[in-house]
Each structure stands twice: as C-alpha cells, then as structure tokens.
C-alpha cells in the first residue's frame, strides 16, 4: 500500500533522536540503475534494436494490478509509474507539486476545492486525459464499496465531485479535509474502467497493454514472476531514458545479491533492505556502492485486540490475556529496543518510539519520560503479577485457569529480521515465564485477516502526509462483516483515537494538525496494541559501472526504491547514453536492478490490506 504529505516546514525531531538518526544514516549515497531482462545474460543486455531495459529484482509479489485494490508497495509503485495522481511530491524535499492537476484552490470555507487539469496529458491509447476521468474515478469510489477497498478513506468526506469542463475538477466536501493536496488516488481512464463489472474482484491482469498516462505503460505480467513496462514516449514530463522496465520477483535475496555481483542486475534493496551481513559483504567490492539512508517505514509488534467487524461480530482466536493493557505493556517493557537496533539491524536503524518515523520530523512523536515503556524486565514482571499472571512452580506464567501463557507470533518467512527478533523475544519473554511460538509463513494473509494470531510483526512505509497510515487504525477501517475485507491493519477500534483522527483530518493549520497527529500516536502508544521497535534504514546497493545517474528521494540522504513518486525509474540514465541530466550521479551503464521489495509487515512496507500474503507499503 501508499500514503502522503505535509509540505515544507515542520518541527525538527528531538535532539537526541536527530543525533541517532544522523548516526544511523551512515554514508548516504544517491544512485541506481539496471538491466537484465528475463534470462539475464548481462545487466547491460537489452531487448534488441538498441533498446535499454532496466530490470528490478523484487522480493515481493503483486497483490493486484487494480489501483482500486492494490496496497502492497510493489503494486502501488507500479501504479505510480502508470497513472497520474492529482498531485505529486517533489523529489528534493517532499513538498507538493503539480501532477495531473496544474493548480488548485479552495473556497473561503474550505469546503469546495477546484483543480485545473492539465491539457497535455494523454492516455496511452491516444485519448485525452480530462477532468471527467478524475471525477469518474472519485465518484466510483464513493458509490462502489469494491472500488473503495484500497483508498476509500480519501473520499469518505466527499459530498460531490463534478467536472464542469475538461480542464476543471470540483470537489465539494462535507467537512474541511486537510489532505486535499495529498490525495493518494491513481486517476484512471473512464472510457476503459466504466466497462468493469465487479470492482472487488477485477485485478486488471488479463488484457495488455493497460491504458495509462504515467511515465511507463504496463505491457505484460506473470504472477510471482515479473511485471513488464515500456516507456511512455508521450509522457508530458518527458519520456524515461530506459525503453523498458521489468520488476522480477526474487524469493531468495541472497540470490539477488549474487546477481548484483555478477552484473546481472544493477541494484538491490533486499527484503526490504539489505541485511547488515549482505551490506557488509558488498562494501569494498569493485563497482559496487552501498547506500544507507534514513528510511520511511517503521518496524513494529502488533497485538491482536480481538478481531471484530463493524456489525459487532467477533471472530478470530486472539489470546484473551492480551486484552489486559497491563499484559500488553509488560510485554513491550521486556523488549530491548536498543539491542534490536544494535544486534539485529547492527546500527542501520533508529530505536522505535512513535508511529511515524523521525524522517518526517513535523509529525515525529516521542513519549514523555513518565509515559515511556522503557526496557525494564523487573517492572514487566511486576505488571504481570498485578494482572494476575503469576509464575507457577515451573516458572511459567499462568492465568486463573492455571494455563501457562504461550503466544503465537505471526512472522514473515521471507524477512530475516522477523526471525532474528523472534529469537530475542523467545529469550526475553521466556525470562518472564512466557512461551512464544514463531509462526513464520510465506503467506500471512489468511491468518491475519481471520484474526488468528496473538501478536504479529508489522510495518508500513509512511508517506509525507501520514493520513493513510493513521486511518487504518480507525473503527471505519474494520470489515463490514467477518467475511469482508476491511482496510484495517490490526482491528484496532478506539473512540478517543477516532476523535483525534477526525480532528487532524479537518485541521488546515499545519502546526495544529501536527499536534493532533502526535496525540494520535500517543494514544496508540498508551493502548499498547502497536509497539514500534525500530525505524530501519533503507540499505541498498548498486553497480557503479552500470548507472550514469538516478534520482533519490529526498535528494539528500534519500532512498531509491519505494519512493513517494516515480522519480527514480523515470530519471534513470543508462551509463552509455551520454545523458546525465536529472539525477544523482555515479558511473556505470544501468541495466539490471534488484530492488528487494518490502515484505508485508516486519519488512516495512505496507501491510497488504486486501491480500497480506507477503508485503508493505503502501508506499
């Protein structure tokens, strides 16, 4: 899945966090590239006729190619490449810039927003992209629950959307909404999508090429294998330098790193980042550089609050002991976050605190000294005693029914961090008398959506505007019934949190809104259902002999894969092209890329709302 912005100014992170963030950033290089197609001979091989192909090896499969359903980082990244959004984010510093809309203005009461739609954007089938396409997209989401699956939170407050002319879009709101310049919704061609029947089941993966108006055109797809795109030579901002872009799935990230060494690919980001061992093994290698930049995701431990639907029906089998806040707090007090950063991430991360990473300083939250659940095993044991879970003669924590506590922790089989942290949890919680079973699966979707877990490794990539990742913890995000799929991340439903969410959504003053967002994070922290352990860096590596230049985001200490836009792939320049404009420079020839996509939860990428099989981001 994806998310959004708060432009320009913002409060800086607390001093000690800023210092840790800078230390964790390490040497932040900016670059990228790519090459090999399917049976990659060398990274520089193209498709013939002089075509240049950029191949991105990813560690995540596609959940859906429908922009109305997709939530995984890979899928939403593809949609950013193939469809325009009303606005975009500047690669330099994340401030809002024009996209399909060239300008926008609000009425004095902030309830009517008028967007001017550019006249130089065409769909890849030759038809003009107009305001009618945007109006139809939003109206479909407002009237069809299936079409609102991925991004429905953006239109829930819309009263009416019209297109008075081909270049004018008007959105009327029920109440003020602060995200009107950060609507993370791909605009689709009405003349194509109005033929679709059931939006809840249509995955847009049968007929190619797919009509779009982004910098690339989606031309082919094979599930769990590859996604192929071609450069849109008529893209209004200018055609990409590469003729083809291929995302190729790698389940084994060591194999992806090996491919980088061989020159079969030009860039590797890991799963979702390189492990310290992988990164260290690449340092000093000829023609390879490691980029270590502050990330935009969090790595957390989510606790099942008791899965339920909007109709009140409870389902799943979460351990009832976790409904006691003292138990939840005790568990987190027995987690040594510093050890996780030092030993698991080996310094390539920052200790966790609030829900939003310190990279977004205006929204970054840090608990007060009195509020913080610092590492305190003795205090954790005391809380468990107070909650009635005392140790028996065997040293096991038991409830009033005499049954020992044994929690199932859902983890991603493809994420080495989940497994490493899981072993520490077994040690730390074992000292409290609590047993845990690591349930590491390739596909965490089914048990997650069914509420059949006690705790789970969780993670999302956060956009400049945090509204989306905040919305997934509201009561409105719950599934309508146990058989439906909601947008909820972890079945949290808390009235105080919901009230704060509504307040920030309607607050146009940036400072006041940021304060409300911090209060929301404080509430999440106190309830203990979302415990952020770390903010991992984006650790990537690329071949300097295969890339001329590529854009990082932000331009200073930024990441390459999983950006809030299409800048990296759109700007990438083959090393032998003679065109080094518009990007971070290096040397090389670009033609193979391994961007290890984020796997669901622990990886930090978006948690798939609709299909959680193995992935993140939302953006």
Question: What are these language model-derived features?
Answer:
Residues 47-49, 222, 296-299, 332-367, ...:
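Detector for C-terminal structural segments
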Residues 116, 150-196:
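Surface-exposed binding/hinge segments that line
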Residues 185-240, 244, 377-378, 382, ...:
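Gly/Pro-rich hinge or "lid" segments in bacterial periplasmic/extracellular proteins
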Residues 57-108, 139, 211:
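N-terminal lobe/hinge region of extracytoplasmic solute-binding protein
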Residues 148-151, 160-162, 219-230, 246-314, ...:
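Extracellular/periplasmic solute-recognition and catalytic clefts
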Residues 2-44, 591-612:
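Secretory targeting and sorting signals
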């Amino acid at each position: 899945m994806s998310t959004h912005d708060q432009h320009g100014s913002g409060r800086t992170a607390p001093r000690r966090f800023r210092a840790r963030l800078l230390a964790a950033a390490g040497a932040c290089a900016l670059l990228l590239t790519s090459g090999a197609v399917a049976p990659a001979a060398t990274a520089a091989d193209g498709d013939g006729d002089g075509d240049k192909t950029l191949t991105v090896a990813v560690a995540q499969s596609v959940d859906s190619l429908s922009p109305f359903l997709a939530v995984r980082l890979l899928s939403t990244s593809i949609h950013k490449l193939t469809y325009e959004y009303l606005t975009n984010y500047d690669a330099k510093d994340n401030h809002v810039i024009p996209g399909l809309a060239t300008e926008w203005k609000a009425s004095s009461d902030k309830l009517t927003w008028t967007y001017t739609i550019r006249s130089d954007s065409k769909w890849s089938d030759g038809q003009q992209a107009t305001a009618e396409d945007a109006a139809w997209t939003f109206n479909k989401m407002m009237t069809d629950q299936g079409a609102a699956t991925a991004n429905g939170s953006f239109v829930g407050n819309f009263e009416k959307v019209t297109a008075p002319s081909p270049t004018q879009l008007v959105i009327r709101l029920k109440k003020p909404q602060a995200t009107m310049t950060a609507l993370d919704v791909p605009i689709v061609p009405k003349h194509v999508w109005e033929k679709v029947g059931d939006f809840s089941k249509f995955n847009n993966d049968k007929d190619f090429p797919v009509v779009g108006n982004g910098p690339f055109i989606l031309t082919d797809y094979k599930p769990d294998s590859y996604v192929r795109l071609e450069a849109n030579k008529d893209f209004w901002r200018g055609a990409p330098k590469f003729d083809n872009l291929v995302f190729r799935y790698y389940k084994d990230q060591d194999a992806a790193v090996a491919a980088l060494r061989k020159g079969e690919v030009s860039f590797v980001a890991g799963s979702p980042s390189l492990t310290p061992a992988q990164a260290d093994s690449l340092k000093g290698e000829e023609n390879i550089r490691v980029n270590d930049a502050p990330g935009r995701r969090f790595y957390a431990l989510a606790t099942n609050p008791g899965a339920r639907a909007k109709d009140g029906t409870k389902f799943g089998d979460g351990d009832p002991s976790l409904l006691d806040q003292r138990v939840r707090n005790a568990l987190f007090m027995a987690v040594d976050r510093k050890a996780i950063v030092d030993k698991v991430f080996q310094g390539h991360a920052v200790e966790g605190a609030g829900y939003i990473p310190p990279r977004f300083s205006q929204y970054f939250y840090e608990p007060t000294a009195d509020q913080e659940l610092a590492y305190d095993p003795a205090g954790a044991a005391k809380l468990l005693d107070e909650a009635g879970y005392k140790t028996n003669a065997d040293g096991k924590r038991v409830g009033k029914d005499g049954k020992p506590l044994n929690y199932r922790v859902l983890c991603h089989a493809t994420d080495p961090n989940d497994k490493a942290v899981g072993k520490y949890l077994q040690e730390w919680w074992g000292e409290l008398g609590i047993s845990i079973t690591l349930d590491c699966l390739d596909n965490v979707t089914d048990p997650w959506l069914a509420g059949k877990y006690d705790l789970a490794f969780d993670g999302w990539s956060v956009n400049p505007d945090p509204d989306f990742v905040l919305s997934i913890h509201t009561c409105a995000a719950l599934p309508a019934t146990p058989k439906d799929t909601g947008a909820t991340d972890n079945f949290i439903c808390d009235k105080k949190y919901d009230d704060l969410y509504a307040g920030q959504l309607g607050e146009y003053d940036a400072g006041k809104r940021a304060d409300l967002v911090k209060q929301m994070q404080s509430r999440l922290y106190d309830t203990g259902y979302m415990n952020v352990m770390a903010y991992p860096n984006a650790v990537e590596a690329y071949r300097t002999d295969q890339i001329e230049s590529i854009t990082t985001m932000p331009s200073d200490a930024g990441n390459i894969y999983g950006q809030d836009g299409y800048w990296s792939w759109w700007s990438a320049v083959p090393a032998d092209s003679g065109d080094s404009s518009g990007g971070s420079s290096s040397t090389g020839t670009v033609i193979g890329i391994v961007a290890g996509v984020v796997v669901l939860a622990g990886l930090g990428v978006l948690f798939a709302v609709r299909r959680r099989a193995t992935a993140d981001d939302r953006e």
